[in-house]
């Protein structure tokens, strides 16, 4: 696991962009993409660049159950706003949050991942060490599955909705085994609130209590953290 500590979020975006551009340059066909605040600066760098994804495929980690792609809180909407409207891919896949058959959708998404092996996967990390919506306790051999959102996640998301009743109660999410199948992983972390998770991921035991700790077993992981997020590392 390679650790790069940077001064601020804009440096983090630049470092992540350099790794992604190198992968594209070396012939990457499929990029694994993330949502949330962690990759925003990376996407800004991509939008400002000459990178061309028109012959490439993207796959996203997750989507809320029950939200349409037009819903501003959906991850489809987030990706369009931050990246796809400026830099379209030949094909972009996200789980279908409006599916009537969640098990079938998980199977469909596993098939997509099998047919489009990820060359570089972008990840963030949660304060409790989760990757995507894989919360503590998720088995390391998990594949795409429905995840019931924790009470704390629902409360944290409530500010984006008119009422807490509108907040999705579950999400469809790539499993840890799907994430580990990527050839290369770049994990981004910003802010003091992520410092303990980064320390546990890098220095702690490999345990399902800290889902991100499984990345210690991956042969090609780069962690890019700002000084606050890296502040507890030895």
From Swiss-Prot:
<dbReference type="Pfam" id="PF01182">
    <property type="entry name" value="Glucosamine_iso"/>
</dbReference>
<dbReference type="GO" id="GO:0042802">
    <property type="term" value="F:identical protein binding"/>
</dbReference>
<dbReference type="GO" id="GO:0019262">
    <property type="term" value="P:N-acetylneuraminate catabolic process"/>
</dbReference>
<feature type="active site" description="Proton acceptor; for enolization step">
    <location>
        <position position="62"/>
    </location>
</feature>
<feature type="active site" description="For ring-opening step">
    <location>
        <position position="135"/>
    </location>
</feature>
<dbReference type="GO" id="GO:0006043">
    <property type="term" value="P:glucosamine catabolic process"/>
</dbReference>
<keyword id="KW-0378">Hydrolase</keyword>
<comment type="similarity">
    <text>Belongs to the glucosamine/galactosamine-6-phosphate isomerase family. NagB subfamily.</text>
</comment>
<feature type="active site" description="Proton acceptor; for ring-opening step">
    <location>
        <position position="130"/>
    </location>
</feature>
<dbReference type="GO" id="GO:0005975">
    <property type="term" value="P:carbohydrate metabolic process"/>
</dbReference>
<dbReference type="InterPro" id="IPR004547">
    <property type="entry name" value="Glucosamine6P_isomerase"/>
</dbReference>
<keyword id="KW-0119">Carbohydrate metabolism</keyword>
<comment type="pathway">
    <text>Amino-sugar metabolism; N-acetylneuraminate degradation; D-fructose 6-phosphate from N-acetylneuraminate: step 5/5.</text>
</comment>
<dbReference type="GO" id="GO:0005737">
    <property type="term" value="C:cytoplasm"/>
</dbReference>
<dbReference type="InterPro" id="IPR037171">
    <property type="entry name" value="NagB/RpiA_transferase-like"/>
</dbReference>
<dbReference type="InterPro" id="IPR018321">
    <property type="entry name" value="Glucosamine6P_isomerase_CS"/>
</dbReference>
<dbReference type="GO" id="GO:0004342">
    <property type="term" value="F:glucosamine-6-phosphate deaminase activity"/>
</dbReference>
<feature type="active site" description="For ring-opening step">
    <location>
        <position position="128"/>
    </location>
</feature>
<dbReference type="InterPro" id="IPR006148">
    <property type="entry name" value="Glc/Gal-6P_isomerase"/>
</dbReference>
<protein>
    <recommendedName>
        <fullName>Glucosamine-6-phosphate deaminase</fullName>
        <ecNumber>3.5.99.6</ecNumber>
    </recommendedName>
</protein>
<dbReference type="GO" id="GO:0006046">
    <property type="term" value="P:N-acetylglucosamine catabolic process"/>
</dbReference>
<comment type="function">
    <text>Catalyzes the reversible isomerization-deamination of glucosamine 6-phosphate (GlcN6P) to form fructose 6-phosphate (Fru6P) and ammonium ion.</text>
</comment>
